């Protein structure tokens, strides 16, 4: 595979990993909270009540009047609380997202022992 065909990786990360991925492409998931005064999207990036909110800049607008939205964002981490969006995928959310299970899966996918199960390499 040559450099032009190489697929760009957007590793899934957790809120506590944001600082170590500054300037890098990542995938984050969360519940849409609102749009702030700067037309940025605010998502809850972890279990409710932990105040793990991330601002998503440079995104296409989400219909917040529709059903509660769950989103997956691919973009670049600008700092501990801001991701510049390159791609946004919306999901209708009927049940609360299980961030505890998701967190365990992310830790497994990043472990030396099991990471090969989660990549094509």
From Swiss-Prot:
Q: Provide this UniProt record's keywords sorted from A to Z.
A: Chromosome, Nucleus, Telomere
Taxonomically, the superkingdom here is: Eukaryota
State the compartments where it is located: Nucleus; Chromosome, Telomere
A GO molecular-function descriptor: DNA binding
GO terms under biological process = DNA recombination; DNA repair; DNA replication
The record ties this protein, via InterPro entries, to:
NA-bd_OB-fold, Rfa2
Query: Could you tell me which Pfam families the record lists for this protein?
Result: Rep_fac-A_3 (PF08661)
Q: GO CC terms for this protein?
A: chromosome, telomeric region; DNA replication factor A complex; telomerase holoenzyme complex
Protein's job: Component of the heterotrimeric replication protein A (RPA) and holoenzyme telomerase ribonucleoprotein complexes. As part of the heterotrimeric RPA complex, binds and stabilizes single-stranded DNA intermediates that form during DNA replication or upon DNA stress. It prevents their reannealing and in parallel, recruits and activates different proteins and complexes involved in DNA metabolism. Thereby, it plays an essential role both in DNA replication and the cellular response to DNA damage.
Return the similarity comment: Belongs to the replication factor A protein 3 family.
* Oligomeric form and interacting partners: Component of the replication protein A complex (RPA), a heterotrimeric complex composed of RPA1, RPA2/TEB2 and RPA3/TEB3. Component of the telomerase holoenzyme complex, composed of the catalytic core (the catalytic subunit TERT, the telomerase RNA template component TER and TAP65/p65), which is associated with two heterotrimeric subcomplexes: (i) the replication protein A (RPA)-related subcomplex, composed of TEB1, RPA2/TEB2 and RPA3/TEB3 and (ii) the CST-like subcomplex, composed of TAP75/p75, TAP45/p45 and TAP19/p19.
Protein name, as recorded: Replication protein A 14 kDa subunit
Q: What species does this protein belong to? A: Tetrahymena thermophila (strain SB210)
Gene that produces this protein: RPA2
């Amino acid at each position: 595979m040559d450099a032009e065909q190489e697929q760009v990786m957007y590793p899934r990360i957790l809120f506590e990993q944001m600082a170590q991925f500054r300037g890098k492409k990542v995938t984050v998931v969360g519940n849409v909270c609102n749009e702030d005064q700067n037309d940025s999207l605010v998502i809850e990036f972890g279990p409710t009540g932990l105040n793990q909110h991330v601002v998503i800049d440079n995104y296409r607008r989400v219909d917040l009047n529709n059903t509660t939205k769950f989103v997956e964002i691919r973009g670049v981490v600008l700092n501990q609380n801001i991701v510049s969006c390159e791609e946004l995928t919306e999901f209708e959310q009927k049940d609360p997202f299980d961030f505890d299970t998701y967190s365990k899966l992310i830790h497994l996918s990043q472990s030396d022992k099991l990471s090969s199960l989660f990549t094509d390499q």
